[in-house]
Amino acid sequence: MASTSWMKNKDDRTVALAEYQRLRALTAREVAEVMQPMLGSDNAALKSAAHRLYNGVTPREGYEDGENHEAENTLILDYALLLNDRVGPSPRRQYIDKYGASDDAEKREVAEVMSHYRFTLLRPVRSRKGFGVKCVDLLAQQEMVLVDVAGSEHFHEGCGEVYATGLLPFCDPSWNCFMDTGALMTIPDIFRPNDVAQLLVDLEVTRRQPLVLAENEQPKLAAVAFKLAYEAQTLCQMRYR
């Protein structure tokens, strides 16, 4: 299993945090452009999913300007809730195709960042408050750093929870730093259908090599994990409210 230095150098953490804040605000603003058509889609399932995420069902991270940029969730919808062969090119792909060679430097940068998006399942290992969370990427089977200021205050070491999310890499590749795409969906122990429970067992115990998914398999895995996470959150809300 690959390891990470856990950003021991304070100067490195300062650089990573500044880049995280810049890039997060930039992607949130730009992605809003592709979220709007989804809200008015003729596809009922897509429209319902877009409204559910857009209206804040998932936990949101606050920004310095006081806004919650719900539109980031389009990156998650791309893999978790869209079937591209039925709906057409995904919003992420449309953005990349439209702005990948744009004269607008910011739009071009966002398109480049989006092109490296990937879905995964994370297990938190250790929190560094005010910066982020050291996690095990269960699909890549390696440690990584999730730069997440808000999350760093709430994760509990050894809690055993698994989170489904999308990741965007940034900064020096050797740092193995990522930011999530706006939602960390919890998969708690109290609600795990057999298929996902077995998936987690396979990832954590029996596999000795990283799990490699074909492009057409990623949406299936993401859809299962996110459906499970959404239903689990709903169950928790019903049970404990």
Q: Predicted segments — roles?
A:
Residues G130-C135:
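Short aromatic-glycine-enriched beta-strand elements
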